Amino acid sequence: MEMFTVFLFYMFSLVLANQEERLPNKCEVCKLLTVELQDALDKTGRSKEVVELGEVLDTGKRRRKIKYNTSEMRLTEAMDNICERILQYKVHAERPGSLRYAKGTSQTMNTLKNLVEKGVKVELGVPYELWDEPTVEVAELKRQCETMLEEHEEVVEDWYFHHQDKGLERFFCEAHVLKDSDQECLTEIWKGDMGMKGSEEESEGKDGKETHDAGEL
């Protein structure tokens, strides 16, 4: 029984770790912002829709037609409420660095929920029905995401219209937002339970930099 109590205390300490000391940093925010924005754009990248621009004048001049997948409308729709998607992330306290932010329930929380289902009384300081609500860390991720996007919206637009040959993370984070800041988190890639940084060869994308799939985070 004593060992079981110690185990529970350890699990609680992972969940209730001092969140003020582990709020997301600029690199982590930038990384997740680009992951979500790229994912939103990828979902509409193959659209064959055509967008008509301008008004039909009395002169009979026709409205200009452009492809949706290269239009400003596509970018605007992708960016709309993009930071709301950050609220889908959970804190995986058992993972290192930026990998602690991922979608899906963490191993720690799964363990605690299984204990509850077995009739074990678990106290986390919040009602059970609120366990899946966004944490302080995730709420801060969203807030910083909104601020970052507002301050660097022109950089996103520049990439979209002129530099899509470069990866979004590389152009937005490395070359601009984090140009004079720590970029270590950009090299972190989830490799199963190990949570190790991928090697340079394994993590390279088409532009020579690591790519991230929103579904993997």
From Swiss-Prot:
Residues 194-217 are annotated as: Disordered. Keywords: Disulfide bond, Secreted, Signal. This is Protein canopy 4. It comes from the Eukaryota. It is found in: Secreted. PANTHER family: CTG4A-RELATED, PROTEIN CANOPY HOMOLOG 4. Belongs to the canopy family. GO terms for molecular function: signaling receptor binding. The gene is cnpy4. The lineage of its organism: Eukaryota, Metazoa, Chordata, Craniata, Vertebrata. Pfam families: DUF3456 (PF11938). Residues 1-27 form the signal peptide.
